[in-house]
């Protein structure tokens, strides 16, 4: 974090604030999640949900999606100009699950967007509270990251499916602002840029005229966001080349894919935040907790402590394993989809298994699924320890590159090695070092070749007991150095489809 002077912390991005001191940040983040909690309580009242139904994560997700849709100005405008059959542009809704005679029933509800906006503003002191909306988007994004694989999207843009660990935040909407940009992985940014360049190649007018100028500004802004994630001079210099290109084409796509591959070892800085479902904040507010007064942080002990004391339920399909469903949601809550499983398991206190071994599908239930056979169970979201979330890629020795793995983007600031299969990664870098970026490419490859899988990242950083809120006594775990921990290993998850 070389340029800390110019960066806002991500709590500031999250709350849209300018530079504040730690107490002000904690208060404004507290205000944000408190507003989400108040909104949730009000919605439960409107929908006449029982206490149990209000703690159902599927209901929480429906309510969150309704408010996000109510504030999606661009889409609302589009829907009004292109009326489609059976879609009322002024209404939003979704499935709400209720318990009737010992069975779960699905009820489709519909609300005026205007009404939802009113309830949201009322819960947020009359303000639009965009930060709270972004927070919900990031929670949905983290859930998608833990649930789905993006192989198809990676292949479509010419990237390698093994680069999945770079795809954090790939389902975040465009409108997620600075807080959203901070949590996007290198692969996500590369993919957005490649899509843009491809449109430019296929559509002559993409970069032309008044619209083209706006497109160009967006392109350069995205390039700068990606550049800011890289930690080595050579990677940044290559990003300058991509950004300054007169009319971006295949050469730029090549450079971007090269950079994405290099990020498997020379990892980018990607922020991690524990964003919890709205019902969790609702429960806390309902029990009388004053978030704004107490203060709150997305990257410290607070989310862990909140989850220790919250009981959340989930619908379970007939052949799903409730413990596996819990793991999925736990990972989503802590933005740990791309974390090393050794680290996650240690913090959680129970073994976290790779996704290929999970007997569970996604959290959301499709409208055609049979409710007759649905059961519900408690999600086990507690942890044994807590650890500080990181926004660095865990590169060792003074911001130079260190070992990475085909599948890790660290979430927790905890000492470990980042094992990786150098041969696998380096095989992707054969040949092509000519052209205007040749010296940078050579430099990047040299750094990658000198990286050692046994190097230790986050030297001396440990986890903390849940009673240690000031983080005074770090417990530095020792991991089996040979055993890599990829969540996506032997993957069989469903693809993410909008």
UniProtKB/Swiss-Prot annotation:
One of its GO terms (biological process) is symbiont entry into host cell. It holds the Pfam family Flu_NP. Keywords: Capsid protein, Helical capsid protein, Host nucleus, Host-virus interaction, Ribonucleoprotein, RNA-binding, Viral nucleoprotein, Viral penetration into host nucleus, Virion, Virus entry into host cell. Residues 1-21 are annotated as: Disordered. A motif (Unconventional nuclear localization signal) lies at residues 1-18. Late in virus-infected cells, may be cleaved from a 56-kDa protein to a 53-kDa protein by a cellular caspase. This cleavage might be a marker for the onset of apoptosis in infected cells or have a specific function in virus host interaction. Signal peptide: none annotated. Its main location: virion. Transmembrane segments: none annotated. It is found in: Virion; Host nucleus. GO terms for molecular function: RNA binding; structural molecule activity. A motif (Bipartite nuclear localization signal) lies at residues 198-216. GO terms for cellular component: helical viral capsid; host cell; host cell nucleus; ribonucleoprotein complex; viral nucleocapsid. It comes from the Viruses. Belongs to the influenza viruses nucleoprotein family. Homomultimerizes to form the nucleocapsid. May bind host exportin-1/XPO1. Binds to viral genomic RNA. Protein-RNA contacts are mediated by a combination of electrostatic interactions between positively charged residues and the phosphate backbone and planar interactions between aromatic side chains and bases. Encapsidates the negative strand viral RNA, protecting it from nucleases. The encapsidated genomic RNA is termed the ribonucleoprotein (RNP) and serves as template for transcription and replication. The RNP needs to be localized in the host nucleus to start an infectious cycle, but is too large to diffuse through the nuclear pore complex. NP comprises at least 2 nuclear localization signals that are responsible for the active RNP import into the nucleus through cellular importin alpha/beta pathway. This is Nucleoprotein. It comes from Influenza A virus (strain A/Parrot/Ulster/1973 H7N1). The lineage of its organism: Viruses, Riboviria, Orthornavirae, Negarnaviricota, Polyploviricotina. The gene is NP.
């Amino acid at each position: 974090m070389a340029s800390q002077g110019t960066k806002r912390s991500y709590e500031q991005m999250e709350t849209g604030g300018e530079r504040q001191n730690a107490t002000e940040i904690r208060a404004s983040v507290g205000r944000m999640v408190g507003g989400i909690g108040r909104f949730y309580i009000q919605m439960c009242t409107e929908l006449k949900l029982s206490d149990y139904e209000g703690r159902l994560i599927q209901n929480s997700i429906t309510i969150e999606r309704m408010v996000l849709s109510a504030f999606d100005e661009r889409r609302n405008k589009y829907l009004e100009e292109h009326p489609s059959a059976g879609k009322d542009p002024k209404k939003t809704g979704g499935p709400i699950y209720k318990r009737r005679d010992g069975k779960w029933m699905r009820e489709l509800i519909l609300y005026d967007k205007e009404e939802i906006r009113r309830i949201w503003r009322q819960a947020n002191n009359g303000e639009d509270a965009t930060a709270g909306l972004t927070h919900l988007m990031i929670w949905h994004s983290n859930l998608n990251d833990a649930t789905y694989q993006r192989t198809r999207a990676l292949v479509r843009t010419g990237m390698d499916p093994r680069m999945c660990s770079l795809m954090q935040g790939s389902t975040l909407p465009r409108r997620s602002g600075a807080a959203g940009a901070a949590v996007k992985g290198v692969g996500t940014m590369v993919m957005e840029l490649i899509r843009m360049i491809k449109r430019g190649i296929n559509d002559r007018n993409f970069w032309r005229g008044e619209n083209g100028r706006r497109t160009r500004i967006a392109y350069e802004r995205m390039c700068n966001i990606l550049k800011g994630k890289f930690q080595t001079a050579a990677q940044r210099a290559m990003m300058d080349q991509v950004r300054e290109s007169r009319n971006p084409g295949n050469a730029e796509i090549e450079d971007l894919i090269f950079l994405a591959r290099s990020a498997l070892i020379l990892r980018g800085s990607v922020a991690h935040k524990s964003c919890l479902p709205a019902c969790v904040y609702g429960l806390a507010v309902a029990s009388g907790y004053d978030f704004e007064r107490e203060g709150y942080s997305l990257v410290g002990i607070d989310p862990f402590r909140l989850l220790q004391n919250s009981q959340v339920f989930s619908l379970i399909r007939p052949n799903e394993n409730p413990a596996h469903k819990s793991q999925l949601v736990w990972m989503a809550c802590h933005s740990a989809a791309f974390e090393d499983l050794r680290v996650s398991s240690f913090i959680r206190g129970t073994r976290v298994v790779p996704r290929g071994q999970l007997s569970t599908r996604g959290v959301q239930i499709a409208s055609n699924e049979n409710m007759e056979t649905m059961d519900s169970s408690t999600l086990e979201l507690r942890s044994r320890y807590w650890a500080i979330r990181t926004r660095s890629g865990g590169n060792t020795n003074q911001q130079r590159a260190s070992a990475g793995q085909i599948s890790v983007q660290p979430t927790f600031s905890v000492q470990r090695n980042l094992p990786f299969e150098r041969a696998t990664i380096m095989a992707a870098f054969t040949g092509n070092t000519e052209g205007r970026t040749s010296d940078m490419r050579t430099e990047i490859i040299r750094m990658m070749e000198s990286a050692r899988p046994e190097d230790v990242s986050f030297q001396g950083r440990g986890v903390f007991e849940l009673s240690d809120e000031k983080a005074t006594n770090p417990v530095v775990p020792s991991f089996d150095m040979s055993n890599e921990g990829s969540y996506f290993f032997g993957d069989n998850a469903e693809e993410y489809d909008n």
